[in-house]
């Protein structure tokens, strides 16, 4: 035991005599430590190459085996025993940092810590890894500290911003959608046309928007661009507006109330020569029953219906902008059909199938769409042009009827369609398998599979006669009602069922 004590004393004296040359000499005697620090400060041996250092910059206390050169003793942090060698000792894992937790290369030597007299500056250097300019300490760990700090702050800020923006955007989106729906239903025809494009993919049988219809007609090389194109778009817009107003009716499940709301718009369009009767419902006998009989129902007699029919007929024939099913005696040069109209091939089409509004043309089997390239290029999708309108997918409509529907061309493809349709009897395939003796809800005739007509109690022959005159149809036009009279009540079928998101 005595020899061990003497040996330790000799080692300490040897350390004191060489402290100016070896900064790694650290003893437990604080006076000797302070002398070594002052000597290092004067000679700046810390940065001198070849000198033994307290800790090298590539060492880490978390590694399995780190050697820190020191004289005096060996410190094993796992035990309480110190082992002394003859020449020098090695410390395995751990170091003396004057009470500081040892970290890799941060304040690796006590001298760098002791030179910071200000406690606040010293604390800041420990916290920020030497970011204070006047007391910068070289440390590879400072970058890691910055990275962790920045990473956490960035994540927190990004998460908050994303959540905030997401909620705000969702709120604005809901508000905009609601506003767009209100605008479409209430006033703006343009907005209604734009919104119709958003429902193109909702159902393969949903209609295309009115804009594509207008563009396709405008691309026709065999007819100049006239006001008739705008008139076509107007039809679809007005038609959509009428449906929307009917949908917003306070009692939209009541057939009389729905008819009352929609007929107001119908009457105003008639006075402005954009009458809805110009769209020519095949299943309704006259314009009076199309625009006025829904209001009147059975409350008006046949005389008042005839008067309304005469009024609408005069308005349509005198200043019609969309002479849909009127003969070519319309005098307006901008009439859509005035350039290619024929008595047999007049523009017409079903405006209601089973209570569902329809405003597109129908091309029969003998009329093949053509294009400027001479090939039969047309879209295979079966769609109509009125926003919100659909074709009933009832099993009563056979496949032949579906194939008979001509799709409107997409704008910009230079596809040309003939400006005619076949006679209305070619549409009989739509109703080939329908039930017999179906009653027309508007007071029309009933029909069976043999097209034998029966007079309904609400039907008036004088009204039928006037309707034939006002329509100006061909010799077979009186058969329209018998082929298309099996309408379904609007109270039984909601025209917006398949498009509840509009």
Swiss-Prot record:
Composition skew (Low complexity), residue ranges: 1-10, 28-47, 155-171, 242-290, 309-327, 446-460
Residue span of region Disordered: 1-57, 155-181, 212-362, 438-487
Subcellular location: Virion
Listed GO CC annotations: virion component
Polar residues bias spans: 212-230, 339-348, 470-487
Domain of life according to the entry: Viruses
Official protein name in the record: Uncharacterized protein L452
Naturally occurring in which organism (per UniProt): Acanthamoeba polyphaga mimivirus
Keywords: Virion
